Amino acid sequence: MSPDGASWSINTFDRGGKATVSFVGSDRSDLNPRRILSLWGNTNLSDPRIHFTEDSLSVTHIPLDAFFKLGLYSKTGMAVFENKQQRLTLSFEAPPIESLCDHGCNFELYMCSRFLELEPLGARTDIAPGQCASHWEDWYLEPV
């Protein structure tokens, strides 16, 4: 039997700035739960750095002592980070929820006082000796 795992990239950004990730559901008329949000134990949803809109989650990097981590499923597979007059758009896979580790999340976000991480996750896969696994992400950098 092959090990079961998933590829995961950690993109680390300097303090300051704001990250926004799409959090759109599949169909607003669908009455089943389709918007996944996973919280690590120390995450406090009343943290002033976290902001929800109808279609997205935004976090503003403010160097507070408390750190947090959360994950979600982004159907559009897109996150944006703006800092120092630059905008980085990060596009990544949106595989079926059932194929993902970490409770169906394809994107995780970690913040501490010194930096912020944007973390796309690939689909769960079996990997045999001599094989490889990967996921894709595209970066697009532009001035703001």
Roles of regions detected by a PLM:
Residues 1-132:
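A contiguous, surface-exposed recognition patch within enzymatic or periplasmic domains that forms
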Residues 132-143:
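Short, hydrophobic/aromatic-enriched beta-strand segments in well-ordered soluble domains
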